[in-house]
Amino acid sequence: MFKVIKCNELNEKLINKKVEINAWVKKIRHHGKFIFLNIRDRYEKAQVLITEEHLLKIAEKIKLEYCIKIQGLLSKRPPNMINENMKTGSFEILAKNIEIISKCNELPFMIEDDNNASENSKLKYRYLDLRRDSLKNKIILRCQATHLIRNFLVKKKFLELETPTFVKSTPEGARDFVIPSRIHKGSFYALPQSPQLYKQLIMIAGFDKYFQIARCYRDEDSRGDRQPEFTQLDLEMSFVKKENIFKLIENMLFLIFKNCLNIKLPKKFKKITYKTAMNKYGSDKPDTRFELTLQDISRNLKNSEFNVFKETLKNKGSIKILIVKDEADKFSRAKINNLEEIAKLYKTQGLYFAKIENNKFSGGIAKFLKTEEQQLIKTYSLENNDIIFFTANKKWETACKAMGQIRIKIANDLGLIDENKFEFLWVYDFPLFEYDENTKTYTPAHHMFSLPKKRYIASLEKIPNKTIGEIYDLVLNGVELGSGSIRIHNKELQQRIFNIIGFQKEKSEDRFGFFLKALEYGAPNHGGIAIGIDRLIMLMTKSTSIKDVILFPKNSFATSPLDDSPSKISNEQLKELGINIVTDDA
């Protein structure tokens, strides 16, 4: 009788015992009168030794990635044959029976991490690509993390509740994926961009702690690393302050990193306001793994004769600087030109510089800084071989963002970023609204259900551009990992927010009438957060793309080479749905 085991279960106690393993063939080595097979299952790899003549005939027919059953005796390898690179490298199975469960066609690419297959080929044969250890392990880590999340939240008395997948179309920024109704011709469901409204309804229903590993859908233009469908941890709590949510998430992530990566995170994450993040790092999702920071030099240049600075300050704008210590000799004219191109992309007045040589400014705009030279050198403790970059704009936010991007570029070029660090950061007190210069209207900075801070509520309509919300983001290594807020739980206040963004009563009733009605029935104060599972696992596994941590992702054009979706449907189906297809050239 053979004991059925997995590859990782080979151990000393099974020496000279009969074992049976079902696995895939990873490697074949022919040595004349015997053959070695390296086999692999989900758990580990193992070596099989084939010496018997009748089994050699079967083994001769076996090719890579055949699915086989091996029965044999487990034996200890000779000391000089032990493979230290395999966890089971001290053992091998002496084959007594071999069964080919299933053959494998010629492979479209080698099942190795360093194969040169195209992305489309890997996605088309995703089931083969998933056999690679590196990819498989990322998916397994994802499973472990979501399992820990569930267990952690259930122990905290959260209820895992499912919200609808077919919902009313209430666009939240991106376009909705819509689904035609066969029964109600001309009407459409939408796939949810997030469970936002439903989780708030759950709070109104009296379920004070909710979570869901939610599938979300956004019909966005093809762009970089976006996926049309993604997964987020969605949670909401009643009678809560943002500090309660911070603590909950910090404890949860501490558990995940300890169990999945054996990394001990700090019990509390750093916290900074949106304004500080922009002023100091030039980003609302700053990478804090390195110390290069922005400074505002506007006051020190108030009497500057340099026209760009003069005009900026005349328009009550902002001048930002970035000082790079003892690295001036690394910045050639070509490198500085590259940085100037970044500044242009962000529509600043330009990027300017000056190096410190012989305790004086040199190069760049040095000749325009003669008056302020010694004052600036003293104020900012500038030394020889330092370089100082300047950018200016009448808009504070534009100057910050441009210099923030230059900061990241310089850090990458100089190797300042520690790729092994995990730096979490809470950014809070975001603006409630953004002003659109083209349409001359206000739009929600995050979403329209976030509560303004108390001191701004009375004057909302007068100063929407200065209103701060109870909004917070969780950032990891310069990536926005999660976003949340304390929500509005008052119908009148919610309608005031709608009015500011141009959703007058009729429009808001049409789109959100069901939700506004619910706010009339004793809504509790509540708040929550949504954390991107795909992004979290991507960062934990140091992957370069979220495609690496999604089981069956789409490509960059939102199509699936695996099943050729999206695809056309038959005329009969279209007729049944009451849909006519209009082509672009019609």
UniProtKB/Swiss-Prot annotation:
Annotated site (Important for tRNA non-discrimination): H31
GO molecular function: aspartate-tRNA ligase activity; aspartate-tRNA(Asn) ligase activity; ATP binding; nucleic acid binding
GO biological process, one term: aspartyl-tRNA aminoacylation
Keyword field: Aminoacyl-tRNA synthetase, ATP-binding, Cytoplasm, Ligase, Nucleotide-binding, Protein biosynthesis
EC number assigned by the record: 6.1.1.23
Binding sites annotated in the UniProt record for L-aspartate: E172, R218, H446, R487
Catalytically driven reaction(s): tRNA(Asx) + L-aspartate + ATP = L-aspartyl-tRNA(Asx) + AMP + diphosphate
Cellular component GO terms, alphabetical: cytoplasm
InterPro entries membership: Aa-tRNA-synt_II, aa-tRNA-synth_II, aa-tRNA-synth_II/BPL/LPL, Asp-tRNA-ligase_1, Asp-tRNA-ligase_1_N, Asp/Asn-tRNA-synth_IIb, AspRS_core, GAD-like_sf
Chief localization: cytoplasm
Cell compartments where the protein resides: Cytoplasm
Record-stated family: Belongs to the class-II aminoacyl-tRNA synthetase family. Type 1 subfamily.
Alphabetized NCBIfam families for the sequence: aspS_bact (TIGR00459), PRK00476.1 (NF001750)
Function: Aspartyl-tRNA synthetase with relaxed tRNA specificity since it is able to aspartylate not only its cognate tRNA(Asp) but also tRNA(Asn). Reaction proceeds in two steps: L-aspartate is first activated by ATP to form Asp-AMP and then transferred to the acceptor end of tRNA(Asp/Asn).
Assembly mode: Homodimer.
UniProt-recorded name of the protein: Aspartate--tRNA(Asp/Asn) ligase
Natural source organism: Borrelia garinii subsp. bavariensis (strain ATCC BAA-2496 / DSM 23469 / PBi) (Borreliella bavariensis)
Gene field: aspS
